[in-house]
Regions:
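Extreme N-terminal segment that seeds HTH/winged-HTH DNA-binding domains in transcriptional regulators
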Residues: 1-33, 87, 91-123
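Short secondary-structure transition/capping segments
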Residues: 44, 78-79, 120-122
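Short glycine/serine/threonine-biased micro-segments
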Residues: 24, 29, 60, 67-69
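Short, mixed-charge, low-aromatic patches
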Residues: 8-14, 46-56, 67-73
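Short secondary-structure capping/turn micro-motifs that flank functional sites
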Residues: 39, 74-75, 116-117
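N-terminal helix-turn-helix
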Residues: 33-65
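Short, charged/polar, Gly/Pro-enriched secondary-structure boundary elements
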Residues: 80-85
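Short, Lys/Arg-rich nucleic-acid/phosphate-binding segment
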Residues: 34, 66-74, 78-79
Length: 123
């Protein structure tokens, strides 16, 4: 996993986003055991407290659960994962639409560009 961070937002928030993306994309499948806080903190080169805070946020969102003395796991509730996936997709779409509108494109023009892009992708 790419653990590069930027200064635009807190590191724990970026960790949450990266792990969430791994979960909703299936890289971390339902029921998968996650590495320990210390191991992941060392891997990402962040403070264990930062990693712990990210895990707490993921638990609060229902994407991760803890089992006493066994560790943390990705939820097995596929509905929660799908809802998180839809929410992330909505954020991406809103960001894309805002950027395209700033470039001066209308909704129809954006749709046309997307259709063109899809056709090019098929070729």
């Amino acid at each position: 996993m790419d653990w590069s961070f930027n200064n635009d937002m807190p590191i724990y928030t970026q960790l949450v986003d990266k792990i969430k993306l791994s979960i909703v994309s299936g890289q971390l499948p339902p029921g998968e055991k996650l590495s320990t806080v210390r191991d992941l903190a060392a891997e990402a080169k962040v403070n264990p407290n930062t990693r712990q805070r990210a895990f707490q946020e993921l638990e609060r969102a229902g994407l991760v659960f803890s089992q006493r003395s066994s560790g943390r796991y990705v939820t097995e509730d596929v509905e929660i994962i799908m809802e998180a996936k839809k929410a992330m997709a909505r954020q991406y779409v809103q960001s894309f639409m805002k950027s395209m509108e700033q470039l001066g494109y209308t909704g129809e023009e954006i749709l046309h560009l997307l259709e063109e892009g899809e056709e090019e992708e098929k070729q």
